[in-house]
Amino acid sequence: MKRPFMILALLLCLPAFAEPQSDSGPAADILAVRNIEITFHTAGSVLPSKDLDLMMSLYADDAVLTDTAHDNKVYRGKEQVRTYWVDVSGPFRPEHHWIGYTPAMRIKSHVTGNSATLYFECLWMDVDSNAIGAHAFTSMDLARVDGHWLVKRVKVGKVDKL
């Protein structure tokens, strides 16, 4: 009689073991990679002030950005990536007074040696209207260069549902 209950209990627990982990890799590297998301949102947020140079400090000189919200337009090299942030992206537009935030369940990072991936969704909150200005995703491929993590490739775009 105990055996069917044990099997049932085991079956009920299996989904918990099957769910993918949000992070994988050495803890110190995960922390460093996740700090990129913090720097990203600090740079694009109006409080204390928007900081394009801080945003660009995240990117390698040969970084490639793909804007999935605009027909997969590609920006190659750090100067073109800067152009994207100045001319296309919402956070750096002068009329937008946004604060960026990523809910904990919407960030994932994986580190293997000197390579990493980082995915997060951004809720850009408009401080003037107290409403969501944009809901976007960022998917990055990172490389450790001289001890620092830099963005090599990134895809950005809109998220349709919260």
PLM regions with names:
Residues K2-L8:
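Sec-dependent signal peptide recognition
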Residues L10-A18:
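Hydrophobic h-region of N-terminal signal peptides that target proteins for export
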Residues A18-L58:
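Short, low-complexity N-terminal intrinsically disordered segments enriched in polar/charged residues
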Residues E19-Q21, H135-L162:
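Short beta-strand edge/turn micro-motifs at domain boundaries
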Residues I38-S45, M56-K73, G90:
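Short, solvent-exposed secondary-structure junction/capping segments
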Residues Y59, A69, F120-W124, M140, ...:
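A mature extracytoplasmic/lumenal domain signature
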Residues V64, Q80-N130:
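Surface-exposed, charged secondary-structure patches
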